[in-house]
Amino acid sequence: SMIEWGGEVVNSEPDGKHTSTQMGSGHFPEEGFGKASYFRNVQVVDSSNNLKAPKGLGTFTEQSNCYDVQTGSNGDWGHYFYFGGPGRNPNCP
C-alpha cells in the first residue's frame, strides 16, 4: 500500500520566469517553526481501524530552490513535515 500527501503550484512561465506564487507560508522548511508551514502528528488508519505512524516516509521535490519539504519525528510532534517556499527568488529565476 502507498499513501501520498502533496502540494502543487502551477508554473506556466508566461513571462519566461518562474511564478512568484508561494507554497504554504512562503518560507522554506529549514526556517522551521514559526516561519515554515507544517503538518504534525501524521498518522494512518490500519485495516483494524487503529491509528499508526506511517513507515518508510520519503520526499520528492522537483525544484527545491523554489519549494521544498523536510520530514522528521519526535516525541511531541510524532511524524511531521515542513513544506513551502517563496516561488521566484534569486536562486529560482
Regions found by a protein language model. Name each.
Residues 1-93:
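Exposed, interaction-prone regions of secreted/extracellular proteins
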